[in-house]
Amino acid sequence: MSSFTYPQRYLSKINFPFICYKFNYFPLISSIAVVALSGALKLHFAYEFLGRTLPLHSFIVAILVTYASYAFDRGVGCSEDEERSGLFKSALLVSAVIATILSFVLFANILLAVPYIIGYLYARGIGGHRLKGGYGVKNAVVALTWASTMPIFLCDLSFAGLLVYLFFFSKSFVNTIIYDVRDAERDREAGIATIPTLMSKTRLRALLILISAATHCILIAAALGGMLACADILVLSALHSLGYIIIYSGACNVLRNTLVDGEWILYTLYSSFRAVFL
């Protein structure tokens, strides 16, 4: 009995794992997965800071929303060779659509469209105008997406809630600037105005430390005053943020994804250890 095998160009169109292996997309997939999990953990800690418990279905929805937003952005922005771009872009966009549909099935709230709308304007824009502007606009948009999504789940506009949203806005704003440092030289050569291209490393580091320290001090004071919970997590976040700002506002890239994108995973491990042993 004769055997028949598909040529690779056909196999790659129908076999998603093969696409990932052939074009080495596993780092990108793992990066999106870490960001999606971290997004849900941010919401988890937002609930914790307010002394509440995050419902399981909301946790799952947060993963889906974060995944869909990042997968859509990466799919639209994929600019490698035509075969690589076309194949993986389609897979990312299809998975983003599926995640979006599932999120609305689990959380039927029209306000859930807000992060998707912001994500679309960020990745695609309207009339050629996107929200990926320079001078910190991109950083503020990403941070605002996080901060505006949390009230949809928490339904809390109290002063304590606003402090929590401010905290996550600040954290996201600082972290996106940290990631812009990596591309500072290339952006400068291309004439793209990002905050790291406009400031010296010393001034940039001082600015990020100031933003982070001020926000953490406000939240820690609120926690010590009984307005918020989990003061130890906030102290840990303050120290951790100070560390990676000092390290990654320079040329170092070692373990950056783990320590920056994965910070809330690290805090979850600490929280679990505390619950079991302390």
Regions flagged by a language model, labelled:
Residues H44-R52, I98-F107, P151-D156, C217-G225, ...:
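Hydrophobic alpha-helical transmembrane segments
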Residues N139-E185, A213:
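Functional transmembrane core segments of multi-pass inner-membrane proteins
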Residues H44-F72, A113-I117, S158-I178:
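Membrane-embedded alpha-helical segments that form the functional core of polytopic membrane enzymes
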Residues R84-L157, L242-Y248:
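Intramembrane alpha-helical segments
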Residues E80-V94, D232-L278:
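Extended hydrophobic alpha-helices typical of membrane-associated regions
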Residues V61-S95, S172-H216:
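Solvent-exposed interhelical
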Residues L37-K42, F88-A99, N139-L154, P196-K201, ...:
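Small-residue-rich segments of transmembrane alpha-helices in multi-pass membrane proteins
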Residues M1-F26:
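Short, Lys/Arg-rich, polar N-terminal cytosolic tail immediately upstream
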